[in-house]
Amino acid sequence: MLMIRTIVRPEKVHEVMQGLLDAGYPAVTKISVVGRGKQRGLRVGDVVYDELPKEMLFVVVPDADKDFVIRAILDHAKTGDGKFGDGKIFVSAVEEVYTISSGTKETEPTLAAAKEA
């Protein structure tokens, strides 16, 4: 299993979440965050904004679905104007997943079945 974390512009978050839903991934965690990239924020005249608002989304997927989910995120998060600041995607391994209410340990087939439900 993999955790895909993506940081996107606030104005694109609903489009990305809908894209994930349409791709069969309804289970998403969303957190409002602030941060800056390599450009060190944004300058507007004499005003410098060190930290810019972004949204972070988390989704856990079977290994085999990684490229499909990344493509869904890219297709919906990119602004198309070629500017910096559209966000990042991070992929990391998930060793175990448990459902708190039941204590059940989930597996990749469980995640795949939830996607298809």
Residue ranges with predicted function:
Residues 1-117:
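Positively charged, small/polar-rich N-terminal and surface patches that mediate targeting and assembly
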